[in-house]
Amino acid sequence: MSVFTETPTNAVEPFPFLCYNKIKRSGGFSMIRNICKDEFFLSRKAEPATADDLSVAQDLLDTLAAHKDGCVGMAANMIGVNKRIIAFDNIGEYMVMFNPVLVKKSAPYDAEEGCLSLTGTRKTKRYQTIKVQWQNEQFQTRIKTFTGWTAQIIQHEIDHCEGILI
């Protein structure tokens, strides 16, 4: 997700697991991928992620970090991989979610968002508070409530996993 024109306030505390202060990669190689702009590919629902997809998550983090000046979140399909993996800036630290699902949402509002995969900005409905279930890098299930800006980023990236283009 690229820079938004509306930024709700955020009262989320930093996350203790699956956050990255800096990009980690065994072997020291960075894999920055090209951004996919193929709307047909982006509109496909993503396949569930597995432990075999850990390297995809790292590539996603590397690519997100390379675009940090104009991007706060990415889904795997944005780098050409049709898997349910998202990465985003969670209050200054990168976080990855495997197989994220919105389980609860409240307080709808209208937002205008941009995306590195699409031209321009588009209006969409978002929710101020969301509860998300996902798996961490050990594929343990986690559930957490997010609010504000972070919630908006997560919703945008989960939309990518569902094949929904803003």
Question: Each predicted region: which residue ranges?
Answer:
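Positively charged
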Residues: 20-166
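N-terminal amphipathic/basic-hydrophobic helices that include classical n-h-c signal peptides
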Residues: 1-30
